[in-house]
Amino acid sequence: MNQSTYNSLKSFIWGIANDCLVDVYDVGDYRKIILPMFVIRRFDAVLEPKHEAVIKAKKEFTKAGITELDAALAAVAEQAFVNKSDFTLTDLKSRTNQQQLKKDFIEYLDGFSENVQVIINKFHIRNEIDRLSEQDRLGLLIEKFVDPRINLSNRPVLNEDGSVKIEALDNHTMGTLFEEVIRMFNEETNVTDAGRHFTPRDIVELIADLAFIPVQDKIQSTTYRIYDGACGTGGMLTVGDEHIKKLAREQGKKVSIHLYGQENADETYAIARADMLVKGEGKESDQIRFGSTISDDKFAKEEFDFMLSNPPFGTPWKTDLKAWGIGKKDEISDTRFIINYDDNPEYSLIPDIGDPQMLFLANNISKMKTTTELGSRIIEVHNGSSLFTGKAGSGPSNLRRYIFEQDLCEAIIAIPCLLYTSDAADEARSVD
């Protein structure tokens, strides 16, 4: 997609919020509506060409007594997901009665397969339907998202002569657009934690290069597992997947890549899973898990070949103590953070309660492979405090000692802090 078309699309989506939500929602709440509708319309546009075939197959399968329809109809749709309702968003645009529109829109949402329901539920969009309907904004919102001047499909819109009228929105550009819209909402509302789930594309590319280029000659025709324990919208996993496949092709190798991530924020988790689904990666979408990596590790005892991450920093992790059912960090017994080292069976890697980033690093180290030639590579973004915080014998000091004594650190690279959005404008960052 050329830059002009991309910019027009971004501006149009941003304008939908101002056109549809003014006087109904505060500016800070626009994202609660626009982001899920953006995702839903993307799914809708991808499924649209096969909609009639799906409806026909649904009738045939139902008549034949088949009750588990999701997988069968997804195959008809040629996607990893499906919508079993009788409607598309374009169909709903013609509704003039608000009550009928509301009823049909709910039925439309309910028609999505279970792997999309997980996403819709985390966006909490159903909680907003009554309000949108009562304010006569639901129909306007749908009308804007199906406007023929924009194309959220993965296929181009053609003129009568077959020439391209509006370019397709490919999966990579869709992911970038997601991030751009999120960033715009954050900046508009002065949200200060944008970097919690928005890592600049240049930094993501750098992280992927550091992960794969130094070992490109060792890449074999085999399966590799990539993990991000603070995956946000899934950008690092996506770019990592692209980079290693590109390098493998250049080396004449055929690789199979499996992606794994964990995220504890509803909205970004929903976006990460949505991004996987629209790429046709249904199984990969199931490997994006919800919950706190610190206290609810969804990949316990698993090992990975590459671990790429930009974990949160400077955010207290007291809620994890509560999740563990304990009151003090000294009571933690998780073997990712309390290890047997240097004749000490309770060697602690646990930092102060106010900053979790070292816990994410310890978590990654616990998932390193030790029985393969390549082993594991960890590329993780930290702020400068990870280099010096904690007195001798403290968790951070112990973790640094362990890393260097075990010869696990290949490089520490300083990166310009102003590449980041508002969360890191005054913080030094480094890539380990």
What positions do the PLM features span?
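Non-catalytic, mostly N-terminal accessory regions of nucleic-acid modification and defense proteins
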Residues: 1-215, 284-293, 414-418
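Conserved Class I SAM-dependent methyltransferase catalytic core
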Residues: 30, 34-39, 346-419
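Conserved S-adenosyl-L-methionine
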Residues: 196-309, 313-327, 383-385, 392-399, ...
